[in-house]
Amino acid sequence: MRADLRVRDGLRACADLLKRQSGRIAYAGNSVTAQRASYRVPLHERLVNRFGQAHAAVGAGLGATGAMGTLFTLPELVLRHAPQLCFVECSVGDIGTRPPEQSIGPVVEGIVRRLGAAGTAVCLLHLYRDDSAMGDANPVVRAYERVADHYGIPSIDIGATLARAFDRQQMAKTDLLMDGIHTTAAGAGVVADLIAGALDEIFDAPPRAATAMPPPLHADHFEFCSLLRPSPALVRDPGRCHDGRFRLVYPYLAIEADNAVVLRTGADSIVGLLLVTGPHCGDLALAVDGGVTEYRTWDRWCEGELLRTVVFREPVRPQATMTLEVLDRCTRDDRGTPPLDGGRRLLKLAALMKHTRRGGAGDDGEQRA
């Protein structure tokens, strides 16, 4: 079985480099990339064997944060390692988290431009989930592919390949997938084989003449962005917040219910936030210019703690005052409000996501407010 792929400009120059010397290959994506039984482990073994070099694997998978979470953690999880090649697997996450459709292309373009500026080759991966159309029938995939077309980036569509195989009963879904999304050990091997087979064609494609990075496809692309780490000074009642660390590593500020973050945006817009979800999480109310929008942070994956994103339906404009209130309730679509073992609900805020329309000092890193 052959994976659906678009070679475009291919990766011949990258393949030649990986063959000549040892380097790093990054795997940026969402939970299917991060999970223990992930395609990335057998795929990396196949790539090391192909090139005959002991390339280091850079794992940069998060939970279902979509492209937005990958973009804003790119400096910390990928760029500082200076990989020669980066696989980007975020479309399945975007299908699940449902960010505003108009934001997907600009965010994916931000990932591509930041990797390209660092000299890192890119290949897009579309994986499978059973609760949505796959391939070009899905608007999320189409948004990714428009960016790939513009920049000549290869893409491999495992989602469309497996959907067709399942429909034709060539493979049993339960053999490859634990829950309709995440792979079993056998499924990880199948996905890795399909990707490796597609890469044979992508790596061997005749090289095209080197060209400069093309002008942006989207006027509001996200090449210039950074994380704004919260501090108690941003909180309305600083006495009801405390520092914590997600899995003992990733810092956050825990803010109790009926408290709020209050921020003047300055010259940049705030497009969302990076937070730790789990049994503690509650609804959020964002107030800007007298209007209030509520966001639900709970979903079916919140039985344990996960690093996730909330993407605002409309960015908070520059020179605005935003108030982000943590409500002492939690709405979920399927089974009502989940139980909470004592205490009040919390927002475990890792960072606010800041978008700068033009490059400037600090655009590649993070700040603390």
Predicted regions and their residues:
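Glycan-recognition and processing domains
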Residues: D204-T265, L274-V276, R335-A369
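Extracytoplasmic/secreted cell-surface and envelope-processing proteins
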Residues: R36, D94-I104, S132-A137
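Active-site segments of SGNH/GDSL-like serine hydrolases
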Residues: E89, G93, E109-E145
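Cell-envelope and extracellular/periplasmic
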Residues: L5, Y27, S31-V32, G59-T70, ...
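Histidine-centered active-site loop/cap adjacent to the catalytic His
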Residues: Q21-A26, Y151-P154, K173-H221
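Extracellular serine-dependent O-acyl
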Residues: D4-G10, C123-L127, P139-L176, G189-F203
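Beta-strand-rich ligand-recognition modules
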Residues: P279-R357
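Serine-esterase "nucleophile elbow" of acetyl-processing enzymes
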Residues: M1-G63, T73-Q84, L263-G266, G272-A287, ...
